[in-house]
Amino acid sequence: NPRTLIIAWLIKARGMSGATLEKFAKPELIDHIRNARTDDLPLAVSAELPDWVIEKLQQSMADADILALGRALQQPAPLDVRVNMHKASRDSVLAQLQAEGLAVEATPYSPWGIRFRDHPAINRHPLFLDGSLEVQDEGSQLLAMLLGARRGEMVCDFCAGAGGKTLAIGAMMASTGRLYAFDVAEKRLANLKPRLARSGLSNVMPQLIASENDTRVKRLAGKLDRVLVDAPCSGLGTLRRNPDLKFRQSPESVAELTQKQAAILRAAAKLLKPGGRLVYATCSLLAEENEAIVEALRAEGGFSLLPVNELLAQNKIPLDTGDMLKLSPAVHATDGFFAAVLVKAAA
């Protein structure tokens, strides 16, 4: 019955003691739940993921790793923020927050990140209000870092959304050059405007586009130094924040997304100069949205893979997931992210 299920969840998932629950359940029921075996449950039940997701993950992951991933996705996500290096340094911001008694620490991978051990109302903090801080998962920060944008360059965040990565890229460019922020959703770009005003950046150009084939896109063909494509995806790497996504997605919806991802990446690739850098990223856990999309573009010719582990090592970041970035909440405490870095062949 529902009451028993709730008590079982409180004991098994939340770790509540029998003493805490003795007012709500008989000792016999508590003992029965505590002693119940769960090691013989189907993997989809233990990992709390749909069967179709399990089947896709099993193509590249061991069952033990899938179980660890599923359990990590049930835990609340930490609060990560990015220090706006155009306005402040991480050391100074970290010292100020610690002096205020806040439980914070530097993120282990992103040199811009700070992690809160709890979830204070950071949107009312003076450092947030003056643009020194932006809420951004550490994994998302690393996507911007892999783009490696430099002062004075021509850069595009092709699927900018509300602009978290746009702002990180703009800070890397020290508010110089030109940074296009494309998106098909007017509401998302509207959310970027107040964040952009706080950031102090003057090199960002938000532009609403109808699709990846918009004339605003095509006119930049062959002109850009770097392009980030954080493609629309299933979002299965963000289940800590959006647990309903696993019920809203399906094999059919993922198949539709892969067609869109391939089309967007192909259009974005045309914007690069010879020697330009292209970063393809998702917050998906599925190879068909990740490696398969990258390999399809490479098969068309004209792009080579730049190993992510080498880029991270050059930036003295202690993280090695191979030649492509694969972040997991079970291993890295970030959302699930994928990224590949491609370089356009010289003319």
Which stretches of residues belong to each language-model region?
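Rossmann-like S-adenosyl-L-methionine
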Residues: 91-347
